[in-house]
C-alpha cells in the first residue's frame, strides 16, 4: 500500500492520516480466488466476468486486512453477485459459516432472496420480514435453531428489532444502497455501529452525492478506528480546497483506494451496447406562461425579504416545476366538462413534445421507460396513453410486492410499449432491459436518482443500444436545475474516477436561500417576452439519430439542432454542457424582467385596493389575469339565460359524473384483469363466494321469503351450547362461520386456535388469500375443513367473513355491519345450494359496545327467516354454564322478537 500523506510532516497530520500510515505498514498477503474455486465451494448459475472476479478478490483482500470497505461499482455491474461470491469464499475457503447480515430496501428484498437461491443454493438464507407477530415467530425459530448462513432484512425492520439483531455476532454486515448511511448522526448509522460485526461491506452505485461530510460518514462506518466521527471537520478542512491544490487531490485519491472500489460500464463492460444521451428543449403553451407568471407573483415576500425562509422559496420552485410539466396539475385549470381530448396535449409544451416523440418511437418499434417525479403527473400521462391507445404498465411508490413483480414480468414477456415509473420508486432493484429508450419527463434534483433510473435499461443483459432522452423546459427553472445537477454529478466522476476534484466547502444556509431566490428568476426575460405559445415542431430523426428495426444505430452522433443537444464525446454521465458558461445565476435581463413584473403587480394591487374591490392579505397576492377579470362589472343575466346556464351546468355535471363512472369501471376492469393474470401466474384459485346479485336465486322473491318466515319451527334461530368448530349437525353439510379482518394475519387464541386445532386449512387459506389480495370487506372464503377429522355423514365447511379492517398502524376496527350483511347474503346462497345448515359463534360478544341485537336481526333476516337451519353457539366455560344453557335452550326462540 502506498503511504498517504508522506509529504506532510507528522506533526501537521490529522489523526486519520497518522492512523492510516500506521496501519499500512502491516498488510496481509493478497487473496487469490479463481472461478473454479468458487464453483467447487458452491457457486452456481452464473459465469463471473473478469472485473467481477477481480472485485471478489478485492473484497477477500479487504476482509483479511481491514474492518470494512465500499464496493461502489456503477449500477448494473453486479454488486449483488460479487457479494454472494464473497460469502461463498468465506464459507468454502475459510470455513466461516457466518452469520452474514444483509440490509436492503424493501423493493429489492425478493431480488436478493432469488439471487441467493440461484448463485449460492448451499448457503441457507432466512428472510426476516413481515408483521410484528410473524417476526416474533421467526425470532423464536432463530433462537431455537440459530444455524443459518445469511439473514436478509430491511433497514426499517432492522431499526424496529435492533435489540434482537444485536444479539448475533455477525461475521459480515452488508448494507445495500448504502447512501442511507451518508449522515453519521442518523439513527441507522448509530444503530448499526453498535452491532457486533467483524467486517462491514457497503454497496452503493452512488458513493459520493453531495459533500465531503457524506464521504467521511461512509468511511467512518467501515473503518471507525481510522476515521473517528470527531475528525470529520479535520477531513473537510484538509480537502475543501482540492480544486486548487493538486497535492491534496492526489492525497485524497490515494486515501480512498484501499477502501473504495469503483468501476463504470464504459471501462469494464465494453461488450455492453452503447448508451447515448440527448436533451430536447421545449417551449411553453400560453396557458403555462400565464400560470408561471402568476406563481412568481403569488408570494412576493419570499423574494423581497432578505430573511425569507427557504421553505417558501422551495414551494415556489415546486409550483413552477409543476407548471412546466402540465398546468392541469393545478386544481380548477382543466376546462369543464372534464372530457379527455387534444386539449390535454396542447395545454402543455412538454406533453406536446412527448406526443410527437412517442409517435416516432412507436412507429420505429422501440420500447420506452417513461419517468416522472410526480405521481399526479403519472396520472395525466396514464390518461394520455389511454387516449392514444398505447399499451403500458405502471409502477410508483403505491405499488407493492407481487403487483410490482407482475408488472415487471408483463413488460419483459409481452410487447408492451411503455412502462410508466416514478423516478424514486422505479430507480432501484428493477431489471427492465426489454426497453431500449429511457425518457425523463422531468428531472430529479439529485442526478444520481436519474442515473439509477436509467440503469434499469442500460445494464448487463441489455443487447440493444440505449437512448436516454431528457425533456427540459427552455428558459424555465427546469433548465437551471438541470445545469446545477451537472456540477453536482461531477463529484462521483472526479473524486472517485479521476483524482481531480470540484468539491469545496459548503456555503452558508443564508447564501443558499439567496441563490434559490435568484434561480427562480432564471429565463424570465425570454420566457415572458411574449404571452403566446413558444411550442414548435422539431425534426426528431435528426435529433435522435438513425433507427432500424427497433434498434438505435449508434455509429455516429447526429448534428444537434435548435431544441436539442447531444452529449459531448467522452462524457460518461447523464448531464452535459452546451459550450456555454453554466453559471447558477440569472442574467441581468432576467432580473430586470422580474422587477418589472413586481412593479406591475404592486401597481395593480394599489389600484384595486383604492377602488375597494380587493382585501389585501399580507404575503398573499392574487393570480394575474384573474384580478383583471374581477374588476370588470358583470352583465346581469335574464331569467331565460339563467335557466339556460343552469341546464348547461346540470348537463355538464351529469356528463362529468358519467365519464368519471366510466373511468372508474374501466379502471376496476383493468385492475381485475391484472389481478386475474397475477393469480394465474401463481396458480391461485379463489375460494371467495359470489355476490347475491351475480347468482340468481331461481325465482325466489320477497313473497316466498315471507311465506317461509311464517313457519316458526323452520325459521327460528336455534341457540345451543357447545363448540362451534364441531357443529351439531345431522346428515347435511354444515357451514361454520367466523369473522376475520382484511390483513391476512391469522389470529391467536379463542376461535382462531380452536379452528387451527380442528384443521390446517383455515390459516393456510386465509393467509394465502391475504398474500394474493383476495380479502375485501364483505367477502367470504368458503372451503372444507375435514382434513384432520370428519363426520360419518355430511361435510364441514368454514366460511370466513371479512368484516373488520386493520390499518397500517395495526389498529383494528369493529365489526362493520354493512360488510357482515353483505357476507350473510352470500352465505345464504351457498347454504341453500348445498342444503346445508349454518353454525355461528356469538359474533362480537367480547367487543365492548357491540350491537349484538342488530347482528342477531341480520342473521335472522338473511339466514333463518329464509329457511336455512341456523345455530348460534354459546361456548360453555363451566359446568354451571352448561346446565344453565341447557335449561334455557328450549325457550331460546323467544329471546329476539
Swiss-Prot record:
Top-rank EC class of the record's enzyme: hydrolase
Phosphoserine: residues carrying this PTM: 542, 609, 620, 630, 638, 891
Region annotated Required for ATPase activity, chain positions: 617-675
Sequence motif DEAH box, location on chain: 176-179
Binding site for ATP: 73-80
Coiled-coil ranges (or none): 640-677
Means of activity regulation: Adopts an inactive conformation in absence of DNA damage. Binding to poly-ADP-ribosylated histones activates the ATP-dependent chromatin remodeler activity.
Keywords assigned by UniProt, alphabetized: ATP-binding, Chromosome, Coiled coil, DNA damage, DNA repair, Hydrolase, Nucleotide-binding, Nucleus, Phosphoprotein
Biased composition (Acidic residues): 692-713
Recorded family membership: Belongs to the SNF2/RAD54 helicase family.
PROSITE patterns named in the record: DEAH_ATP_HELICASE, HELICASE_ATP_BIND_1, HELICASE_CTER, MACRO
Record lineage: Eukaryota, Metazoa, Chordata, Craniata, Vertebrata
Molecular function via GO: ATP binding; ATP hydrolysis activity; ATP-dependent chromatin remodeler activity; DNA helicase activity; histone reader activity; nucleosome binding; nucleotide binding; poly-ADP-D-ribose modification-dependent protein binding
Macro domain sequence ranges: 704-897
Enzyme Commission number: 3.6.4.-
General function of this protein: ATP-dependent chromatin remodeler that mediates chromatin-remodeling following DNA damage. Recruited to DNA damage sites through interaction with poly-ADP-ribose: specifically recognizes and binds histones that are poly-ADP-ribosylated on serine residues in response to DNA damage. Poly-ADP-ribose-binding activates the ATP-dependent chromatin remodeler activity, thereby regulating chromatin during DNA repair. Catalyzes nucleosome sliding away from DNA breaks in an ATP-dependent manner. Chromatin remodeling activity promotes PARP2 removal from chromatin.
Segments forming domain Helicase C-terminal: 353-515
InterPro entries noted in UniProt: ALC1, DNA/RNA_helicase_DEAH_CS, Helicase_ATP-bd, Helicase_C-like, Macro_dom, Macro_dom-like, P-loop_NTPase, SNF2-like_sf
Helicase ATP-binding domain location: 60-225
Record text about domains: The macro domain mediates non-covalent poly(ADP-ribose)-binding and recruitment to DNA damage sites. Mediates auto-inhibition of ATPase activity by interacting with the N-terminal ATPase module, encompassing the helicase ATP-binding domain and helicase C-terminal domain. Binding to poly-ADP-ribosylated histones upon DNA damage releases the auto-inhibition by the macro domain and trigger ATPase activity. Does not bind monomeric ADP-ribose and mono-ADP-ribose fails to release the auto-inhibition of the ATPase module by the macro domain.
Subunit structure as annotated in this protein's UniProt entry: Interacts with nucleosomes; interacts with the acidic patch of histones. Interacts (via macro domain) with PARP1; interacts only when PARP1 is poly-ADP-ribosylated (PARylated). Interacts with CIAO1.
Region Disordered: start-end pairs: 558-577, 611-673, 689-713
Full protein name: Chromodomain-helicase-DNA-binding protein 1-like
Species for this entry: Bos taurus
Primary location: nucleus
Catalytic activity: ATP + H2O = ADP + phosphate + H(+)
Localization terms from the record: Nucleus; Chromosome
Feature: compositional bias, Basic and acidic residues: 562-577, 650-672
